[in-house]
Design a protein with these regions (language model features):
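Generic structural signal for well-ordered, non-membrane alpha-helical segments
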Residues: 14-18, 22, 38-42, 70, ...
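Glycine/serine-rich phosphate-binding loop and adjoining beta1-alpha1 elements at the start
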Residues: 1-64, 261, 265-268, 276
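Glycine-rich phosphate/diphosphate-binding loop of Rossmann-like nucleotide-binding domains
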Residues: 35, 43-137, 141
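Rossmann-like adenosine-cofactor binding region
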Residues: 110-180, 186-187
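Short, ordered loop/turn segments at secondary-structure junctions
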Residues: 12-15, 36-39, 94-97, 141-142, ...
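Adenosine-phosphate binding glycine-rich loop
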Residues: 36-37, 56, 161-270
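General beta-strand structural signal in soluble alpha/beta enzymes
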Residues: 9-12, 33-36, 67, 91, ...
Length: 277
């Protein structure tokens, strides 16, 4: 089908098949291929965290981050956080802290993460991992945390409990026990929803006939989404724009198109400011 389409958006493919399928398609096709459960979620996560760190006055390269759930979305979130400058990241799954295990025992999709993380990590359970950390990112299952777990973290903690339909901690408790709290649900503030990212990413990629969606384009998309919240409006309950914000898609499209051109994957030359609507 590739000759008749400008891009392919993969949806609802479980790990580890999603990594293998996306890699095979990207290698064999000359049109953009993106698994939005991975990269769409990761882009919006980075946008939300960028703004959350501004609110609490912390820096990406200084904070200690726990990512719980290393499936499709969790693995992609780790990768984009590392690309954005995170320097202390702890990866957990149902077995606890897993990225510090023997490389030969890790799934293939995790060995590259292990090569990028710092070696001074704790060993043990998720609860051990939380001690002295600044950010919790949950992409796992509901109700794995309680108030005492969050109190093991540093002050001004940021908690993104993104499991659906039930977040990793009961929302009322999570909101009370953290400085900034976000979920994947629309009935609470700060919804982290991949619908904020993939329409604009593909719009920008298609407009310049990009041959791929690369890391620079995803980082640019995250920056554009974060920028849709004016600095003067940023607050604990407003770190990410609404999915109904009409400015998001065109703004993301323009920055993605510019990043595609800057990285040499755009095959159509257009005036970014004038031709992207």
């Amino acid at each position: 089908i590739a000759p008749g389409f400008g891009g392919i958006n993969l949806e609802d493919i479980s790990a580890p098949r999603c990594f293998e399928i996306e890699r095979a398609l990207k290698t064999s096709l000359d049109i953009p291929v993106m698994h939005d459960d991975q990269h769409g979620t990761a882009v919006v996560l980075l946008a939300a965290l960028t703004n959350a760190l501004k609110v609490v006055g912390k820096r990406m390269e200084e904070v200690r981050i726990v990512v719980n759930g290393l499936g499709a979305a969790g693995t992609a979130c780790c990768r984009i956080l590392l690309a954005a400058g995170a320097s202390h990241l702890i990866g957990c799954d149902k077995e606890g802290i897993v990225l510090m295990g023997d490389a030969e025992e890790l799934r293939a999709c995790r060995t590259d993460l292990q090569a990028c993380i710092r070696r001074d990590q704790p060993r043990g359970t998720l609860h051990d991992a939380l001690k002295g950390t600044d950010v919790f990112i949950g992409l796992s299952v509901g109700n794995v945390l309680n108030r005492e777990d969050l109190e093991r973290m540093n002050q001004d903690r940021i908690v993104f409990a993104m499991a659906n339909p039930d977040p990793e901690i009961e929302p009322r408790v999570g909101d009370e026990a953290s400085r900034i709290f976000a979920t994947g649900r629309s009935d609470f503030p700060n919804q982290i929803n991949n619908a904020l990212s993939f329409p604009g990413i593909f719009r920008g990629a298609l407009d310049v006939q990009a041959s791929e969606i690369n890391e620079a384009m995803k980082l640019a998309a995250a920056e554009a989404i974060a920028g849709c919240v004016p600095a003067e409006a940023l607050s604990e309950d407003y770190i990410i724009p609404s999915v109904f914000d009409r400015d998001v898609v065109p703004r993301v499209a323009k920055t993605v198109a510019a990043a595609a051109r800057a990285t040499g994957v755009a095959r159509r030359r257009i005036r970014i400011d004038d031709d992207l609507r």
